[in-house]
Each structure stands twice: as structure tokens, then as C-alpha cells.
Amino acid sequence: MPTPTARLFTAALTMLLAPLVAGSVAAAAPTGSASGHDAFYLPPDPLPGGASGDVLRAEPVVAPALDALATRVMYRSENATGGPIAVTGTVFVPSRPWAGDGPRPTVVLGPGTQGMGDQCAPSKLANHLQEYEYLHIVPLLARGYAVAMTDYEGLGTPGGHPYLNRVSQGHAMLDLARAALQLTDRGIDEGTRIGFWGYSQGGMSSAAAAELAGTYAPELPVVAAVAGSPPASLADLAVAGDGSLLSGGIGWVVNGFAAAYPQVREELFGAFNPAGRDILARAETFCVYDAPRMNPFFPTAWYTVDG
């Protein structure tokens, strides 16, 4: 029977391999410091009352290389345990008119693995042409779809990123759809239909949004969901990847679980020896492009208590 450490490592391999195998554009992404807050990403304290999906603030931003109107948005959402949080994202509306039937549809895009540092937030990377999800955004805009890309909980905004938590990610997707419906002054068509899209971590997010929509956001006009390679069958990856180039990414999974459920943080971290706890601390500062230098080729036996 797999140990808790082995199960955590299994999850880590899935989230690490998918975006890199998918052909990510590693264009000089920022690394290191996780102190990537600026004024936009600091939510009101206390968070004002309201409903999930309410827009807390929005501002126009530059969309490099895109023929689109871009709006950065902060919106209200819920974490894995139902607590109110603020999440950020970006909404893109193409300049070209919609040639299909009815109002222009909106695709809510769940990004693949980004990392854990606040500087890894997709809305920050997209501003500098360092976001590999442009590989999906560009063709969607070319077809006339509006695209809304979430940063997820804890990327850019204060607090940890609950990596691979389907509830948090599903809520972030659904609440961005709600927020987008309020941006008719920024090009979103009234009566827009909603679709979900994502690969890897984003595939999990797209599937989670589709699964949760009926109970969490039944009012949304959801018509489709595309979920590519969501983390699912993990055993083979665990066997093949223990001690691989990307093995240090287990820190993202452990830190993500602790961010979603802080009451188990001490127990989780107790499974790691001092070297392992150092890996966890540094993992909170890394983006996905840093993965090859996150203790590559370290077998889990080197940094866990039980091996």
C-alpha cells in the first residue's frame, strides 16, 4: 500500500509533467522571489460583503501581441471550505466581430501549472508575453471567442495557492464566469454563453467547473467544457518519475494541500526531514519554468522521514 509520501509524490509528477510536455513557451519567465504583490492584487481588508462572482475591481491592461481589449479583474470567490476570498484574472475580448449565431460566447480558461510564487500569476506573465497559455488564447480569440483566464486562488493575491484542489479551482472558474457577465462595458456580450477550457491543472479546473456548475452556479449558461489531460491516473507517473528531473515539484502539491486545509499543515510537514522542509519553503517561490532546478533527480527517500 502506498505511503502518504508516495501518494503526494504521485500527484506532484502529474502536475509537473503535463505543462512541459504540452509544449510550454519558456520565454524568460521570472523566478525567485514570491513577493509579487502590487496594489491591484491586494484585496480590500476586510473583504466587502456580497455574492460570489462580484467584481471587486477592474482595470484595462495591455495585451501584448493580441488584437483584443484586455481587462484585469479581481472578483469574489470561495475557497475549498467555503470561505470568502478574492481571486484575480484577465478577460480578453477580440477586436474582430463574432460571426456565429447569437451573442459572442465566452471561454473561461483554466491555466495549466504555473507554480506557487505570486510572480507566477497568469495575469502577470501574460502582460510580458511569458504566459504559455497564449498558445490557447490566440486561436480562441482568432475564432471570435472572448476568453477569461483565472489566476486561481493564491496566485498574485495573498495566501497560499491550493494547487490541484478541484473545489477551489472550480469555484475560481465559475466565479470568473459570473464576473465576466458583469463586464458588458468592456466588450462582453449580454446573453453570452459560457464554455470551460483547460489542460493539465487547467483540465482539472475545467472538469471541476462543469461538475460543480449545477449546484454552485446553476444560473450560468454553461454549454460546453473541454478538459485536456486532467490529473487522474497517477501510479505509472510515480514509478517512472521518482528521482526524475522534475521530482522537486512535490513541494507544490504538499504546500497546496496545506494551503487548502491549514489544519493538517503540521502533520504534512512532519513527514519531511530538514532538507525536505527546505524544499517546501523554496517551492513556494518558484514558477513552473523553475521546475528543472527544483532539486532535480532527488528521490523522495532523500527528503522524507519514512523514505
Where are these regions (language model features)?
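Secretory targeting and sorting signals
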Residues: 1-29
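Catalytic-loop region of hydrolases
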Residues: 27-102
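Accessory cap/linker subdomain of secreted extracellular hydrolases
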Residues: 45, 228-307
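Solvent-exposed loop/turn segments at secondary-structure junctions
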Residues: 80, 112-117, 153-157, 201-203, ...
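Short, surface-exposed "cap/lid" segments of acyl-processing enzymes
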Residues: 80-144, 151
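Loop/turn elements at helix/coil->beta-strand transitions in domains of secreted/extracellular proteins
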Residues: 103-106, 142-148, 191-194, 220-224
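Alpha/beta-hydrolase active-site loop
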Residues: 163-185
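Primarily recognizes the serine-hydrolase "nucleophile elbow" in alpha/beta-hydrolase
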Residues: 178-248
